[in-house]
């Protein structure tokens, strides 16, 4: 179905607003993946704050102008799916990485985070970023561990001090 100029402009405007508010983006080649599989992937993405789109590469170049994702322009070759993360920077990378494990034809091309491009081989760096809840839990654990360590050192010092005075 051919899009007229007004429809193309509407798509670019709508997706550009979304892209400007996104935290990260992941680009993938979806050749060989069925429509039903892509639909399931999109549904899973919506649950974790990931918006996926498939548009012509020329429109995608217009969409990413003046966004932190301009570094991805070289990856828009062939059938391209782009996933934008809005709630957590690693959500799209994690989702597409897990999808690619089960679908060998699905190929992650690259990702962008804070204006820097990550090659597909380094997608784990983005996918393994802890969520906000995980980071808070880890910080609390480290603070508790530090307090327990201080208490243990204090008790050992008191025991040593008492044994020296006795």
UniProtKB/Swiss-Prot annotation:
Q: Do you know which Gene3D superfamilies this protein is assigned to?
A: 3.30.70.1730, 6.10.250.2350
Show the Pfam families listed in the entry.
Answer: Ribosomal_L10
PROSITE patterns on file = RIBOSOMAL_L10
Superkingdom in the source lineage: Bacteria
A cellular-component GO term for this protein: large ribosomal subunit
Keyword annotations: Ribonucleoprotein, Ribosomal protein, RNA-binding, rRNA-binding
What are the BP-aspect GO terms? Answer: translation
One annotated GO molecular function: structural constituent of ribosome
Its quaternary organisation is: Part of the ribosomal stalk of the 50S ribosomal subunit. The N-terminus interacts with L11 and the large rRNA to form the base of the stalk. The C-terminus forms an elongated spine to which L12 dimers bind in a sequential fashion forming a multimeric L10(L12)X complex.
UniProt-listed PANTHER family: 39S RIBOSOMAL PROTEIN L10, MITOCHONDRIAL
According to its UniProt entry, what is the function of this protein?
A: Forms part of the ribosomal stalk, playing a central role in the interaction of the ribosome with GTP-bound translation factors.
- Name the family: Belongs to the universal ribosomal protein uL10 family.
**Protein's name according to its UniProt entry:** Large ribosomal subunit protein uL10
What organism is this sequence from? Baumannia cicadellinicola subsp. Homalodisca coagulata
